[in-house]
Amino acid sequence: SLAITSADVREVLAALPADLEQARKDTVQTALQLVGKVNYFWGGKSRAIGWDSRWGQLTKVWAAGSSSTGTYRPFGLDCSGFVDWIFNNSQGYIIGHGGGVIMQHRYCTNISQTEAQPGDLAFYPDDSHIGIIVGRNEAGKLLVCHCASGQNNVVVTEFGASGFTVVGRPDIFDP
C-alpha cells in the first residue's frame, strides 16, 4: 500500500537529521499532518492557516482540464495547492505565488537526488505533479509527501516509484 500509518509518520519525523534547519523540519511536520486526511480535488487551493473547514464538503469541481470537472466531490487540495498550503502554514510564504506547479518550479533551483534534503520539492518530468521530500527510507530512497489524484488523498510514496524525477530546492531555503 502507498498509504502510511500514523506510526510510519512518527518514524519519518524521528528519522529527520538532527542538524536539519528548523524551517525544513517545520515544513515536513506540516506536510505530514495532512497524510490520509485531505482529499485530492482538481483546482483545490486554500489560504487557511490550519485546518480548512471546507475540506471534505461536497463541492463542484470548477477548474477545467480534468475528467472530474463539473462533478461533485469532497473538497480538498490538488498537488500544487497542497504545497502552497504547507509553505503558507510553515513559512508564511506561498511558493510560486499560487501559480501552480510550473510557477512553483520556477522558484526552485534543480539539484541532484543526492543533495536533496527534507523540505525540498519533487517534480514529475513535465511539471504535471509536485510533492515535498520528507526524508529517506531504509534503502536511502527519497520519500515524497504529496496530494495524489490516484489515491485521492495526501500520501507518502517513494520518489522514483511514484513518477518523480526532478528535485528542486525552494529559493526560500537557498543560503
Regions found by a protein language model. Name each.
Residues 93, 99-113, 126-175:
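Aromatic- and glycine-rich peptidoglycan recognition patches
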Residues 80-81, 129:
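Short alpha-helical basic/polar micro-motif
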